């Protein structure tokens, strides 16, 4: 395994042992953020929530269009690059992949689907069904609204969001690290622009810390919400207590799962969890298609994909000038900023697990196949929710107008074939989705601290435990602080977006450089 050997490399915990937790600037700023957020929340929870809410609203209004443009450009440049001869270049100095295609795709899908697969797949399409999105004029709650509702969900969790997670940025990082010997850190994305002063000085650590903080904010949210969702589900279905103690037990089980998985590495726990989850998701989907409203779901998927494609640009470019500002803030801009916040660290992870794959394989997997799988999953759960809402089996209007997506998920699950058993299966599926995000992000943060792709298992465990503790403290204060932390990722997307920006031109340059080095092009 090729580790970087430049003088700008972050401290190697495995080699020197000088720093057990990696780059001191990244460590101090990232842990400082966690401590400061918790301390300020304990001191004045309302002040913190209100301050984040104001920053969230300003960011969405002032920079929402910029975020949308960044995602669009990333997707189309990546797609253009994928059809060039340079896309034949192999990643990571390996001629053959380290793992099978199924294992590789399973890890990619499970790692990145947690936010959507867990909390929005059942509820978001139903919400857009009962509250017509501004890009459409169909009457809410009618058959004409079905395709539009699903298409809007596809836009939020589809091609352009996924593309920013591991296409152009992953190419830049893979070339810089595995070929040029630069550290596997977000700062490396800016190396072509700022040079050695960035790699050697504290500015590089600040850049890395911004990306770590964004991922912590984005990962702690699902971890905390999972505890509330599973606790609520077990109470509703099996009558178990829905209390803070129950949430702590669920958190402990979840943290044990993803910490042990992260410590065992990509080829052991991480891929085993992902494979199991994919098999379980296929089983759940099979039951829904066999015994649920299968014809409705099949027809809805086809028509919704048609609407998604035909209305792609109107949905992708709608702004607060033509849509209600609150809607843009809480939907399109929120999700796009979420993807941006995760971008650099997920790109590190994708670059690591894609060694031996071609650039074309990586782009197609991340920006095409994974989004298509996501749209299928949203149709299975959300489409079923729409069907049961239309036929009067369930009533989610009040819950969704109050953004109670945990209630929506459980309500839809209980209406599906299998009743309590299906609900239990979806709760298990939900838990493993979050665990696969927890283990991959614990690993990715540790990689940032170490600067290479084999960080100490103890560093991985440290970050996994730190995020679980943060979730536990925030749950003690109330689920509102988890929501506030999730809103904070929109604010962190500001610096992270500028870190991603140079990849629009550096990604193709790196791909062509790799292709020339491998003799694919002249």
Predicted feature locations:
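Flexible loop linkers connecting adjacent transmembrane helices
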Residues: 7-17, 50-56, 83-102, 126-151, ...
């Amino acid at each position: 395994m090729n580790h970087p050997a430049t003088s700008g490399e972050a401290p190697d915990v495995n080699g020197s042992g000088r720093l057990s937790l990696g780059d001191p600037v990244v460590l101090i700023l990232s842990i400082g953020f966690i401590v400061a957020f918790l301390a300020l929340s304990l001191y004045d929870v309302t002040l913190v929530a209100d301050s984040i809410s104001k920053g969230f609203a300003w960011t969405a209004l002032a920079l929402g269009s910029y975020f949308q443009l960044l995602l669009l450009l990333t997707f189309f440049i990546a797609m253009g690059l994928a059809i060039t001869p340079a896309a034949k270049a192999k990643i990571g100095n390996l001629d053959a992949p380290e793992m099978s295609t199924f294992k590789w795709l399973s890890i990619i899908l499970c790692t990145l689907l947690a936010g959507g697969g867990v909390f929005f797949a059942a509820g978001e399409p139903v919400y857009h069904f009962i509250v017509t999105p501004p890009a459409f004029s169909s009457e809410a709650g009618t058959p004409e609204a079905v395709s539009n509702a699903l298409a809007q969900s596809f836009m939020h969790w589809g091609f352009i969001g996924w593309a920013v997670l591991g296409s152009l940025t992953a190419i830049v990082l893979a070339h810089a690290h595995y070929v040029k010997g630069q550290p596997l850190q977000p700062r490396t994305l800016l190396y072509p622009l700022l040079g050695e002063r960035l790699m050697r000085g504290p500015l590089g650590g600040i850049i890395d810390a911004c990306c770590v903080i964004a991922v912590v904010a984005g990962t702690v949210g699902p971890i905390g919400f999972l505890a509330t969702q599973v606790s609520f589900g077990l109470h509703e279905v099996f009558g178990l207590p829905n209390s803070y103690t129950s949430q702590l037990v669920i958190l402990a089980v979840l943290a044990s799962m993803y910490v042990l998985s992260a410590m065992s590495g990509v080829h052991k726990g991480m891929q085993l969890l992902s494979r199991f989850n994919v098999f379980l998701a296929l089983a759940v989907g099979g039951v829904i298609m066999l015994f649920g409203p299968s014809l409705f779901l099949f027809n809805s998927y086809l028509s919704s994909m048609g609407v998604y494609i035909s209305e792609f640009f109107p949905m992708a470019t709608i702004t607060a000038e033509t849509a209600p500002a609150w809607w843009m803030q809480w939907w399109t801009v929120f999700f796009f900023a979420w993807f941006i916040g995760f971008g650099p660290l997920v790109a590190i992870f994708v670059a690591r697990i894609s060694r031996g794959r071609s650039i074309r394989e990586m782009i197609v997997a991340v920006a095409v196949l994974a989004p298509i799988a996501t749209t299928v999953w949203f149709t299975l759960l959300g489409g079923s929710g729409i069907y049961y809402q239309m036929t009067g089996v369930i009533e989610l209007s009040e819950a969704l107008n109050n953004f109670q997506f945990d209630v929506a998920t459980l309500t839809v699950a209980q209406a599906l074939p299998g009743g309590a058993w299906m609900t239990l299966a979806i709760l298990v599926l939900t838990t493993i989705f979050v665990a696969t995000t927890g283990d991959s992000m614990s690993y990715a943060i540790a990689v940032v601290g170490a600067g290479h792709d084999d960080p100490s298992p103890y560093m991985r465990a440290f970050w996994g435990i730190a995020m679980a503790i943060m979730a536990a403290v925030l749950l003690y204060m109330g689920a509102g602080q988890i929501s506030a932390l999730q809103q904070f990722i929109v604010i962190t997307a500001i610096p992270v977006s500028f870190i991603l920006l140079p990849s629009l031109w550096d990604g193709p340059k790196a791909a062509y450089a790799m292709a020339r080095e491998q003799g694919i092009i002249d």
